Design a protein with these regions (language model features):
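Extracytoplasmic/lumenal acceptor-recognition loop(s) of multi-pass membrane glycoenzymes
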Residues: 117-118
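Conserved thiamine diphosphate
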Residues: 109-113, 165-166
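Long, low-complexity segments enriched in small/aliphatic residues
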Residues: 100-109, 126
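Cofactor-pocket helix-loop regions in the catalytic cores of large enzyme subunits
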Residues: 1-98, 121-247
């Protein structure tokens, strides 16, 4: 471990040390299916390297304990001082195309664009001025919280765009029961997904090659996509549909 980095840049290390005391490489080897010697070798290589970086995907985060998985990787990064220098740090890989761009644009219930917190009065005032309308100071609900609110009767209608919660929700049965309870469900999609079967209205959207747009990668590169194919049938770009509803 990097004692200097821990002392000057972190808190809670002693508590973490006590918490993991019983999780030796020998104890974890049968759980992980990796020999204890290999675990030790990888740990030493990571800690002693001039620059080590952790990249992880959905295998880490899409679990009931996904947040704790990520916290463990963050703790490993901090205790070894492998952060804040070229070639170090943490790099969570996004699960689908343009998740990064959507997040940057504010499609997260507790953030405005550029990750400005909804609860931040100064940030809210800036966006109220920019958009010319009052904004709710309370953060929205997460996908899981939304399904819970439907079961409680707090949400009676939903507009789902580019999402398939009947399959992707952590508890698909719970999500499907919620979708069936809704008084009105509008789904905007390019495919007839499982969620579409619960919809009262389906709005046909265009796929990637049928519209103009951008995709943002986690390396900060923004790729421009130009329409290459005509949209089939009545399909329209997502933004066009939203604008028509707003009018």
């Amino acid at each position: 471990v990097d004692e200097d980095f821990i002392r000057s840049r972190t808190i809670g290390y002693e508590e973490l040390k006590r918490n993991v005391a019983n999780y030796s490489p020998e104890a974890m080897a049968p759980v992980c299916g990796i020999p204890a010697a290999t675990i030790k070798e990888v740990a030493r290589l990571y800690a002693k390297s001039k620059g080590s970086m952790i990249l992880w995907g959905m295998g880490i985060s899409q679990h009931i304990h996904g947040t704790d998985n990520a916290r463990c990787l963050i703790a490993l990064c901090m205790m070894t001082g492998q952060i804040g220098r070229p070639g170090t740090g943490l790099h969570p890989l996004r699960g689908q195309n343009n998740v990064q761009g959507a997040s940057d644009s504010g499609l997260i219930p507790m953030f405005y664009p550029d990750y400005q917190r909804v609860a931040n009065g100064e940030a809210r005032a800036r966006f109220e001025k920019l958009w010319g309308t009052p904004l709710d100071p309370q953060p929205g609900l997460t996908v899981v919280e939304i399904m819970g609110a439907v079961h409680k009767g707090e949400i009676r209608g939903m507009y789902i765009m580019g999402e398939n919660p009947a399959m992707s929700d952590p508890d698909a049965h719970h999500a499907r029961e919620a979708l069936a309870k809704l008084e009105c469900l509008v789904v905007q999609e390019i495919f007839l997904t499982e969620t579409c079967y619960y919809a009262d209205v389906i709005l046909p959207a265009t796929a990637w090659p049928e519209k103009n747009g951008t995709v943002t990668n986690t390396d900060r590169m923004v790729q421009l996509g130009r329409q290459a194919l005509d949209a089939p049938g009545d399909a329209k770009p997502d933004l066009w549909i939203i604008q028509q509803i707003a009018r």
